[in-house]
Design a protein with these regions (language model features):
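Non-catalytic, polymerase-adjacent accessory regions of viral genome-replication enzymes
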Residues: 1-77
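Active-site-proximal segment of RNA-dependent polymerases
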Residues: 3-4, 8-14, 32-37, 118, ...
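Right-hand nucleic-acid polymerase module
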Residues: 7-12, 110, 115, 119, ...
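Short, conserved non-catalytic motifs in the polymerase core
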Residues: 58-65, 91-118, 132-144, 204-225
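Conserved polymerase palm-domain catalytic core
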Residues: 75-78, 82-83, 92, 101, ...
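OB/S1-fold single-stranded nucleic-acid-binding modules
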Residues: 355-396
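Short nucleic-acid-contacting surface segments enriched for D/E, G, S/T with interspersed K/R
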Residues: 428-448
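OB-fold/S1-family single-stranded nucleic acid-binding modules
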Residues: 449-462
Length: 462
């Protein structure tokens, strides 16, 4: 039996052949997931991807955005067919240099059309991957993030002060640039068996000659999966490392002694060497009481402060920016960081304002058009036929690509908020009548289809 631990013993020219031998062995004894493409091409998922990519006024007003909005349904149908057949191909990209946390990065930017396709695929793929991740990894994972991971660290420091006296902090050198594409595909093949999906994923992964794209939506999931397989589960399952946290390519381990952490450090180096990655030399083992500089904060057992660089950057921008609107945006962003730390005095010093909870402000969004906004994804009424739903509210006079006076209906399906558009005068009339009743909303119903006229179909509440 050939295992992943043998990869480092093989010459580079033979490694790929060995990887595929491992893949075949794993496929024979692991239960992999299939029928993922069918989930991807559901209208609700494709529609969600379209809306997510075209979120924001600037994107909607761009040349690409205006075209896509004018041809929304045709675009969704075309992409659905291409993904379903496995024939979708990325249409190229342009690059832009950005600076992030003092690092210069090259960002690959796809067309909005391609981004809709990538988002639709990864929206489903990430959902299947998330259940395989350890609890204490947080980058690009829904309902997790820097604040969630920081709270995990704070909780563990407070619950087990004796077992978390020291910290080992590390960072992977040029992670996205140095990721081996064949190792990423090895990981994907351990989980998915749908060949159409694997073909699409391979096209995303191999978009660049080497490494994975920093700007591609799929790269976040690919990087997380690679480190989940070769590092996270290895430390947790084989070595029983209790206090281990990872945010993308940054890692942290807490332990009782320095000796214990140095041993774990050697294990981490060994695992990274297997997949041709390298830990930066600025790694260190140190007492927790010095403060753990991680996730944009300096974390100590009894309090948390903002990282010095973030404070300085905010103060500099506040000094440079004169626009009131821009200053309000900066303060709102800074508040989002400081509210998760012990920084009330700092916030007042730099902004001149008292830190208050949003709930204390007692304000709510008031749209200029006076129309209600409902939560949930937009679904086609066709998807709701014969399903029990709860109708919660509605709004008329909505302008869409299909017409001026459409009605949007807020519903709940299996506890999940959704909404659909209709131009049915019958439905509008019924909803208006229900609105006049003292306790009309919410109400339960099932949407059915009825044939009328010359083979025409209408949707009705029953």
């Amino acid at each position: 039996m050939v295992g992943s631990s043998q990869l480092e013993e093989v010459r580079p020219g033979e490694r790929k052949a060995l990887i595929f031998r491992i893949i075949n062995q794993q496929q024979n004894r692991m239960r992999r997931e299939g029928y993922i493409i069918e989930e991807i091409i559901e209208y609700s998922n494709m529609s969600e991807a379209f809306d997510a990519v075209l979120r924001g006024t600037d994107r909607k007003r761009s040349t690409q955005g205006r075209y896509l909005l004018a041809h929304r349904e045709q675009v969704i149908v075309k992409l659905t067919e291409a993904i379903a057949s496995g024939s979708f191909q990325l249409g190229g990209y342009h690059e832009r240099e950005i600076e992030e946390y003092g690092k210069k990065r090259t960002l690959q930017i796809l067309s909005m059309y391609d981004r809709i396709a990538v988002y639709s695929v990864m929206n489903v793929v990430d959902r299947h991957l998330q259940k395989r991740y350890i609890r204490t990894t947080g980058a690009s994972i829904k309902r997790r993030g820097t604040h969630d991971l920081m709270n995990c660290i704070r909780t563990n420091l407070q619950k087990d002060p004796e077992g978390t006296l020291y910290a080992y902090k590390f960072d992977i050198r040029r992670f996205y640039d140095n990721v081996r594409q064949d190792f990423v595909m090895w990981c994907f093949r351990r989980i998915f068996k749908d060949e159409r999906l694997l073909v699409l994923l391979e096209r995303f992964v191999t978009m660049l000659p080497e490494g994975i794209s920093f700007g591609l939506r799929s790269s976040q999931g690919a990087g997380n999966l690679l480190l989940s397989v070769f590092l996270d589960h290895y430390l947790k399952d084989k070595y029983g490392v209790r206090y281990y946290y990872r945010y993308c390519d940054d890692g942290l381990v807490l332990g009782k002694t320095k000796a214990e952490l140095w041993k774990i450090r050697d294990v981490i180096h060994g695992q990274m060497e297997k997949i041709d990655l390298e830990i930066k030399p600025n790694e260190r083992v140190f007492p927790v009481e010095e403060g753990i500089d991680f996730l944009g904060y300096v974390i100590r057992p009894d309090y948390v402060r903002l990282r010095k660089r973030i404070k300085q950057k905010f103060a500099r921008k506040m000094h440079e920016v004169k626009s009131r609107k821009r200053r309000r945006e900066l303060i709102a962003s800074f508040y989002g960081m400081t509210k998760h730390a012990d920084c009330n005095k700092l916030f007042k010093k730099l902004t001149g304002k008292e830190m208050r909870s949003f709930k204390d402000l007692n304000v709510a969004y008031k749209p200029e058009d006076g129309k209600k906004r409902f939560p949930g994804v937009v679904v086609s009424i066709r998807e709701l036929v014969n399903l029990p739903i709860v109708v919660k509210d509605f709004e008329t006079g909505i302008k869409t690509e299909q017409g001026e006076d459409r009605c949007i209906v807020a519903i709940e399906v299996n506890g999940e908020a959704k909404k659909f558009f209709t131009n049915s005068e019958e439905m509008k009339n019924i909803l208006a009548q229900v609105k006049e009743m003292p306790d009309g909303f919410p109400f339960e119903t099932t949407i059915k289809t009825e044939t009328f006229g010359k083979g025409r179909t209408k949707y009705v509440f029953t």
